[in-house]
C-alpha cells in the first residue's frame, strides 16, 4: 500500500507549479504523514497516519 493515512485516507494531491511567466508544470503537495505504531484489531501495527489525525486524537500510539 502506498503512503496514505490509515485513518483519514489523506494522500498527496497534485496541481501546477506556476513561474513568474505563468508557465505551468505538474507538482505534488505531500500530506504530513508520520509512521506510528497503533493498535489494529488488538495488535500493534506500524502504519502511516496524518499529523491532523494524531493531533485531533483519532488514534492513540502504542
From Swiss-Prot:
GO terms for molecular function: structural constituent of ribosome. This is Large ribosomal subunit protein bL28. SUPFAM superfamilies: L28p-like. Keywords: Ribonucleoprotein, Ribosomal protein. Belongs to the bacterial ribosomal protein bL28 family. InterPro entries: Bacterial_rp_bL28, Ribosomal_bL28, Ribosomal_bL28/bL31-like_sf, Ribosomal_bL28_bact-type, Ribosomal_bL28_sf. Residues 1-22 are annotated as: Disordered. It comes from Staphylococcus aureus (strain NCTC 8325 / PS 47). One of its GO terms (biological process) is translation. Pfam families: Ribosomal_L28. One of its GO terms (cellular component) is ribonucleoprotein complex. NCBIfam families: L28 (TIGR00009). The gene is rpmB.
